[in-house]
């Protein structure tokens, strides 16, 4: 995959120069095509493209013989682009979009057919987002189940790098299409993203109207490649330095994927974004991830809002997958638990004050020892997508009384005189499997601290106690599941009883050692 990106990176300036010298010609943006999904109400969908400076462009939306609306604009001289914002449309279709350029009484007409209105989601990240349906559990069954989802349309962006922000995509691996077993299972780590497809399928089952899915991902890539220079500067990310060879296998240069694979989409009206990335930062700028990730979210939101003429919500819903596990990393390595924590901006949960309107799928219990693609690529993407869609239903669609996150303590009470810590959760808890090592306390004595296991003592429906009598000093902190491989497949100790959502990892500091001291951890 690197070679094509390098080749295209070399010829790209020549291609763009040749097009511009010829006036670029009259065309839609690269991703406006037959079978596409445009964002439904309350937002207006953006239609744009390139043309001859000074020409008038009329965009017509038709359904059968009926004209639904017309919008008129002109081609901007400085960019050779034109753009219109359609009136908000109810979900449904199909429609035809026609664009006509008029200059000195000469007309050129473009048409795209079978256009639907629904919700458009962008899916991005590295290889776990890039894994195709062909690579997951029960692939044959999943690939045969496409006929019922012809209103879920898919598009996959080609892996391309660029030194500067591009206005339009250079290439598309899969143009807007109806799902088939062929385009959903097109090889390994190509197209279409399994997480993206399964997430969209769950949304369609719930919403019963069209869903558009855009996959733009590249394996082995750090967050710096997906971030604009603005957001990296805001976090004080140092200029390109050495990168551990085992952390990054794809493009790593700052902003090159933002420039070529995300920025060209920013004129599009979106419903939201789903993100699965972080493995390539476990040994690279790890300590900055609690800034670079929230900064990426903020920058993408601002850029898409501005690019779509204010049609994409300023704080559109942003979903993330918290990292799973990897057998190749030592259990003592801190990279995986650190990134999991930083994925929440060090709150342990989302949404939070630094990451508003976000939702998260915990995946640390979906480990896969026997994955032929390496344990870092677990094959159970169905559960990932299911957990993601619960968050989307709650945050993006406002569904009430829906459990979409696992239990997290809201209070920790130190009972030092009894040798206990008491944890009170804001949700009900269920002990799936007792593990006396997954909770750890930081025990300090003579200015030296070490982490010791704290075994589970008693458990009730919403609280548990931990034995801390192994600490002969001062207990200053508590952490849960702070390891690369916390448990076997769906066998972590704590889950929500009815939703089967795992308790997420956390770390909490205990600052007061008085009897009965309480520390707030979550919400």
From Swiss-Prot:
Record key words, sorted: Cytoplasm, Disease variant, Glycoprotein, Hydrolase, Lysosome, Serine esterase, Signal
Organism in which the protein naturally occurs: Homo sapiens (Human)
Effect recorded for residue 404 to S: In AIS6; defective enzyme secretion and activity
Function: Catalyzes the removal of O-acetyl ester groups from position 9 of the free diacetylated sialate N-acetyl-9-O-acetylneuraminate (Neu5,9Ac2) in the cytosol and of the diacetylated sialate residues of sialylglycoconjugates in the lysosomes. Together with the sialate-O-acetyltransferase they regulate the balance of acetylated sialoglycoconjugates, key players in various processes such as cell-cell interactions, host-pathogen recognition, and tumor antigenicity.
GO BP terms in the entry: carbohydrate metabolic process; regulation of immune system process
GO CC term (a single one): extracellular exosome
Name the UniProt record assigns to this protein: Sialate O-acetylesterase
Lineage: Eukaryota, Metazoa, Chordata, Craniata, Vertebrata
Effect after changing residue 266 to G: In AIS6; defective enzyme secretion and activity
Outcome, altering residue 196 to F: In AIS6; defective enzyme secretion and activity
Glycosylation sites: 107, 138, 267, 290, 401, 422
Disease annotated for this entry: Autoimmune disease 6: Individuals manifesting susceptibility to autoimmune disease type 6 can suffer from juvenile idiopathic arthritis, rheumatoid arthritis, multiple sclerosis, Sjogren syndrome, systemic lupus erythematosus, type 1 diabetes, ulcerative colitis, and Crohn disease.
GO molecular-function terms, A-Z: sialate 9-O-acetylesterase activity; sialate O-acetylesterase activity
Effect upon mutating residue 400 to N: Rare variant found in a patient with Crohn disease; probably not involved in disease susceptibility; the mutant protein has normal activity
Result when mutating residue 314 to H: Defective enzyme secretion and activity
Outcome reported for the amino acid change (mutating residue 161 to K): The mutant enzyme has normal activity and is normally secreted
């Amino acid at each position: 995959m690197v070679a094509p990106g390098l080749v295209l990176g070399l010829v790209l300036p020549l291609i763009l120069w040749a097009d511009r010298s010829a006036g670029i010609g009259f065309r839609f943006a690269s991703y406006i095509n037959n079978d596409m999904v445009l964002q439904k109400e309350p937002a207006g969908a953006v239609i744009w493209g390139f043309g001859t400076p000074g020409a008038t462009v009329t965009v017509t939306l038709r359904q059968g013989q009926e004209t639904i609306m017309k919008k008129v604009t002109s081609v901007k001289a400085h960019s050779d682009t034109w753009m219109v914002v359609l009136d908000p449309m109810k979900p449904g279709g199909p429609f035809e979009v026609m664009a006509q350029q008029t200059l000195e009484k000469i007309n050129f007409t473009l048409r795209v057919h079978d256009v639907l209105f629904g919700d458009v989601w962008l899916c991005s990240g590295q290889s776990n987002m890039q894994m195709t349906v062909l690579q997951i559990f029960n692939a044959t069954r999943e690939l045969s189940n496409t006929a019922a989802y012809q209103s879920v349309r898919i598009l996959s962006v080609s892996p391309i790098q660029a030194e500067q922000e591009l206005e339009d995509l250079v290439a598309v691996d899969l143009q807007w299409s109806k799902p088939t077993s062929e385009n959903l299972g097109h090889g390994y780590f190509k197209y279409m993203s399994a997480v993206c497809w399964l997430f969209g399928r769950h949304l369609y089952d719930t919403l019963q109207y069209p869903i558009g899915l855009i996959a733009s991902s590249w394996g082995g890539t750090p967050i710096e490649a997906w971030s604009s220079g603005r957001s990296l500067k805001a976090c004080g990310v140092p200029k390109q330095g050495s990168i551990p060879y085992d952390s990054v296998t794809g493009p790593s240069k700052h902003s090159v994927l933002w420039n070529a694979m995300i920025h060209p989409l920013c004129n599009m009206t979106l419903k939201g974004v789903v993100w699965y990335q972080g493995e390539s930062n476990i040994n690279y700028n790890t300590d900055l991830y609690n800034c670079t990730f929230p900064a990426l979210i903020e920058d993408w939101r601002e850029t898409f809002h501005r690019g779509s003429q204010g049609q994409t919500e300023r704080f559109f819903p942003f979903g993330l997958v918290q990292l799973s596990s990897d057998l190749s990393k030592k259990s003592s390595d801190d990279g995986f638990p650190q990134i999991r924590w930083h994925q929440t901006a060090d709150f342990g949960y989302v949404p939070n004050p630094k990451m508003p309107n976000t939702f998260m799928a915990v995946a640390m219990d979906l480990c896969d020892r026997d994955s032929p693609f390496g344990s870092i690529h677990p094959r159970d993407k169905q559960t990932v997508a299911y957990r993601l869609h619960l968050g989307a239903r709650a945050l993006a669609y406002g569904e009430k009384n829906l459990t979409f996150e696992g239990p997290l303590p809201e209070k920790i009470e130190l009972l030092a005189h009894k040798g206990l810590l008491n944890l009170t959760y804001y949700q009900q808890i269920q002990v799936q499997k007792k593990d006396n090592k997954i909770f750890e306390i930081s025990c300090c004595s003579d200015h030296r601290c070490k982490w010791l296991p704290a075994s589970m003592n008693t458990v009730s429906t919403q609280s548990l106690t931990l034995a801390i009598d192994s600490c002969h000093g001062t207990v200053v902190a508590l952490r849960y599941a702070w390891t690369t491989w916390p448990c076997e497949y769906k066998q972590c100790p704590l889950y929500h009883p009815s939703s089967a959502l795992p308790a997420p990892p956390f770390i909490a500091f205990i600052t007061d050692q008085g009897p009965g001291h309480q520390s707030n951890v979550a919400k």
